[in-house]
């Protein structure tokens, strides 16, 4: 049975063959189009089973006529164009402060030469001007972005996460080719408990540098905090593949594996320990579905001292760890 797609192809072929008779100058080009359509759709315009009741041009004219008269279904979309001043102010916000006066002088020269006389082309001219200016100042722009990255690192270390985020945002605005900027912003998003955004930035970092191990391990940490242990282990394994001697990466992988095991198996009752509430029968799998608990457990398990206690089987010291007691103490109050 002939398909509508084949019938449409034949209608187009018939239209092109009529056009060849009316436009001898382009007949050769139209013939090439006819042959291509025949081959692609595997049809023959002489096949009676593929013919429709009216030629394509008539169907088209009827459709256009009906839509032009049916004003009740016509939707008009209006787009408000920005003025030259609005476009310039928007562009100024994307220029490093240190270079802003220089850019404004550049704009003034262009204005004097009449570059913005045509309102319809203002946006195109301004965008091209910005691109040309930033390219001419590439070295300075990269230096400014690097300075912002360093400021962001300092803010992150001080626990000023929103200020750090602002620094990394600007660094990326000025130089979006640097994988480190995205990876550092990913760390900031994780600190702000926005693990989905952290993963997005890790992926952006990996696009720019597929061999950047730290981007994979930060992505693994974000996945761990979301309880997506399979994805976390995959990310950590990739980081280790890139840096096989990195012990921190290996410890992070081991941590994700432990958390995955805990999530899949309900732990046995915990012994009573002075200072710790009765946790018998506590469902650790359910607990680990809580992002706050996962994040705290992730940090604790990444502590080298905690790892050493677990590896040595020193459960007494482990269970009397002040941080662990605090975590379980808080759980007992919930």
Curated annotation (Swiss-Prot):
GO-annotated molecular function: molecular adaptor activity
SMART domains (alphabetical): TPR
TPR repeats: from-to residues: 145-178, 180-212, 213-246
Entry keyword set: Chaperone, Repeat, TPR repeat
GO process annotations (BP): post-translational protein targeting to endoplasmic reticulum membrane
GO cellular component: membrane; phagocytic vesicle; TRC complex
Cross-referenced InterPro entries: SGT, SGTA_dimer, TPR-like_helical_dom_sf, TPR_rpt
Taxonomy, superkingdom: Eukaryota
Gene3D superfamilies: Immunoglobulin FC, subunit C, Tetratricopeptide repeat domain
Protein family membership: Belongs to the SGT family.
Record's function text: May act as a co-chaperone and regulate the ATPase activity of heat shock proteins.
Protein name: Small glutamine-rich tetratricopeptide repeat-containing protein
Classification lineage: Eukaryota, Amoebozoa, Evosea, Eumycetozoa, Dictyostelia
């Amino acid at each position: 049975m002939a398909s509508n797609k084949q019938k449409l192809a034949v209608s187009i072929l018939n239209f092109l063959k009529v056009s060849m008779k009316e436009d001898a100058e382009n007949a050769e080009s139209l013939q090439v189009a006819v042959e291509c359509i025949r081959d692609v759709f595997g049809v023959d315009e002489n096949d009676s089973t593929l013919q429709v009741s009216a030629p394509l041009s008539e169907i088209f004219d009827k459709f256009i006529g009906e839509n032009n008269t049916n004003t009740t279904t016509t939707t008009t979309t209006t787009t408000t164009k920005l003025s030259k001043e609005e476009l310039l102010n928007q562009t100024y916000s994307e220029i490093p402060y240190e270079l802003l006066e220089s850019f404004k002088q550049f704009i003034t020269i262009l204005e004097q030469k009449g570059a913005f006389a045509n309102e319809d082309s203002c946006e195109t001219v301004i965008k091209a001007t910005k691109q040309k200016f930033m390219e001419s100042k590439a070295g300075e722009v990269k230096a400014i972005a690097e300075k912002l990255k360093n400021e962001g690192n300092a803010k992150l270390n001080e626990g000023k996460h929103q200020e750090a985020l602002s620094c990394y945002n600007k660094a990326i605005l000025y130089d979006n080719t640097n994988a480190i900027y995205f990876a550092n912003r990913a760390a900031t998003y994780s600190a702000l408990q926005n693990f989905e955004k952290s993963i997005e930035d890790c992926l952006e970092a990996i696009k720019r540098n597929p061999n950047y191990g730290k981007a994979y391990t930060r992505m693994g940490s974000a996945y761990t905090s979301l309880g997506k242990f399979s994805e976390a282990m995959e990310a950590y394994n990739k980081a280790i593949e890139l840096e096989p001697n990195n012990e921190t990466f290996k410890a992070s992988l081991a941590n994700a594996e432990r958390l995955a095991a805990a999530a899949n198996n309900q732990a046995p009752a915990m012994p009573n320990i002075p200072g710790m509430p009765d946790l018998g029968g506590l469902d650790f799998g359910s607990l680990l579905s809580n992002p706050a608990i996962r994040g705290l457990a992730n940090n604790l398990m990444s502590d080298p001292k905690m790892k050493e206690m677990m590896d040595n089987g020193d459960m007494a010291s482990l269970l009397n760890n002040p941080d662990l007691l605090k975590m379980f103490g808080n759980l007992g109050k919930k």
